[in-house]
Amino acid sequence: TAESSLDAAETGHLVFTTLHANSSCTSLTRLLDMDVPKYKLNSTVRGVLAQRLLRKVCTGCGIKRPISEIDARETGILKNTQIMYANKLTAEEKYNRKKEGTLCAKCQGVGYKGRIGAYELLLLDRKITNALSDGMTTKEVEQLAVEQNSMLTLRDYGLELVKDNLTTISEVKRVCSSE
């Protein structure tokens, strides 16, 4: 159970465990929802790592072009930045391209090939543990971690991967939504 893991941590053991949650901050809320005492959480948890796998844009058929105005506004990526867009084909387009011999050999028209990790590390320091003790919401704790500790959220990490031309904005939106 969650509490027995924290009991082991209190005795000096290094404990790694898995918890299903949407972000590192919601993991803490999940533990509190499991009736783990706040004092135990504050005294034993040092950090929480959230991770997601994003599909990598295909290097064989991905399209590099300037970011759209809408995407730039939604993401904060500079307007003229060149980013990759997936060349996803419909079933009919795949069939026709296969017949013509022009279907991408790397991804078979999916637009993506392989996966890459996106990570969010929340380090629990005095500010964060005090915020939890004070009953701050998950969003408020996340905002505090971003502002005070320079934490990158899953979405922000994903957008860095977009800037590095490793994935697409639509993939980050699909996988790293905060709801």
Regions found by a protein language model. Give the residues of each.
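Short, flexible helix-loop junctions that flank or precede catalytic/ligand sites
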Residues: 1-179
